[in-house]
């Protein structure tokens, strides 16, 4: 299919990071659709150890935004002006809000007309529109896939302000590690304080894994990676392979160490270690600048579609469950294939019709 239906790839993109995004969205879509493969010939593939896709997205957000702000401060005498902050906010809004609000509306309409099951009374729409649905307490039964967006949104809001405040007292090289450490300690402390709410896997998922206060640390691990890349470039390049190997080993350890419900490891540090393992992959992958094959081009285009895919995949499978339940139940492998095709098709339409026009507008804001 020619250039994946004309999705343009900017040659300035770093292919290694595109690959990481593609892996992330594969893990997310696979994770939500793997139940279709249970009790089929492909059942064994559901047990393959894969990273949490959201961990990767969090690390990527912190790394890219951190890299941008550190470079700006170093080239502007450690000063972050009002215009830079307002420009960043405008570009962020144009990147996140169109897809997010459009899919929020679609979710609401599908629930309202009983196409999918959901509860808009317990968690009103305004909380989702203001990214306050899971700041310190969880939500469920509506727009499930939105949970990670408030984590990123509030990072984007406050991160520049921290730079403005802290730059009055020190250079970024000195205060960024402490800022990152603060949020790691903050998230771990929050999870420990919420331990009484965790009585089963579901409560762990919504209280520990899907609240802003619990997951904000993951993005700051990405910021720390950006700090290391900027201030220690020789070591960043020299130890890339070693860091990648350590990251794989740490990831393997998170799959081997028992995560007993209620344990200190499970409640307090598992999410930190899991994100750190992903962060260790970044030094090597940033060295992979470009691709030379059609497969590489396809991977970069999947990376471009990843935001749309993230917001639509749960909606697709929930709608398919309602519209064709017998097909979903009795034809698992085929249904899984159809699920992927529909996710790609719907994501492409969302990207072309909603996301791309605003991204083009965003590029005019410098």
Language-model segments: what does each one mean?
Residues 82-90, 96-151, 183-212, 273-282:
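Membrane-interface helix-loop-helix regions
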Residues 58, 89-90, 94, 98, ...:
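Internal alpha-helical transmembrane segments of multi-pass membrane proteins, especially GPCRs
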Residues 17-25, 61, 92-101, 150-164, ...:
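Conserved beta-strand->loop/alpha-helix structural units within folded catalytic cores of enzymes
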Residues 126-134, 157-158, 162, 315:
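Short hydrophobic/aromatic helix or loop-helix immediately within or flanking a transmembrane segment
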Residues 11-17, 77-101, 117-120, 158, ...:
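Membrane-interfacial loop-to-helix junctions in multi-pass inner-membrane proteins
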Residues 1-16, 23-26, 30-51, 66-83, ...:
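Alpha-helical transmembrane segments in multi-pass integral membrane proteins
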């Amino acid at each position: 299919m020619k250039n994946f239906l004309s999705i343009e790839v900017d040659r300035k993109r770093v292919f290694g990071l595109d690959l990481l995004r593609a892996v992330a969205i594969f893990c997310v879509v696979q994770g939500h659709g793997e139940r279709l493969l249970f009790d089929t010939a492909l059942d064994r593939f559901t047990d393959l150890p894969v990273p949490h896709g959201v961990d990767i997205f969090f690390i990527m957000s912190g790394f890219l935004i951190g890299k941008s702000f550190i470079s700006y401060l170093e080239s502007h005498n450690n000063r972050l002006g009002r215009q830079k902050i307002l420009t960043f906010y405008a570009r962020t809004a144009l990147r996140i809000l169109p897809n997010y609000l459009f899919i929020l509306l679609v979710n609401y309409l599908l629930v309202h007309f009983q196409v999918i099951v959901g509860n808009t009374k317990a968690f009103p729409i305004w909380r989702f529109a203001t990214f306050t649905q899971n700041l310190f307490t969880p939500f469920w039964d509506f727009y499930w896939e939105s949970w990670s967006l408030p984590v990123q949104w509030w990072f984007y809001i406050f991160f520049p302000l921290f730079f403005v405040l802290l730059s009055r007292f020190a250079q970024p090289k000195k205060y960024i590690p402490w800022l990152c450490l603060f949020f790691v300690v903050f998230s771990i402390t929050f999870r420990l304080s919420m331990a009484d709410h965790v009585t089963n896997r579901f409560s762990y998922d919504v209280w520990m894994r899907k609240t802003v206060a619990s997951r904000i640390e993951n993005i700051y691990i990405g910021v720390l990676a950006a700090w290391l890349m900027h201030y220690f470039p020789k070591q960043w390049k020299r130890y890339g392979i070693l860091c990648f190997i350590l990251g794989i080993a740490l990831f393997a350890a998170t799959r081997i160490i028992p995560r007993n419900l209620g344990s200190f490891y499970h409640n307090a540090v598992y999410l930190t270690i899991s994100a750190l393992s992903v962060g260790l992959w970044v030094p090597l992958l940033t060295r992979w600048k470009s691709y030379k094959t059609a497969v590489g081009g396809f991977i970069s285009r999947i990376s471009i579609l990843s935001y749309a895919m993230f917001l639509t995949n749960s909606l697709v499978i929930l709608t398919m469950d309602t519209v064709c339940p017998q097909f979903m139940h009795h034809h698992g492998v085929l249904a899984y294939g159809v699920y992927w095709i529909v996710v790609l098709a719907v994501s492409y339409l969302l990207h072309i019709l909603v996301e791309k026009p605003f991204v083009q507008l965003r590029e005019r804001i410098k």
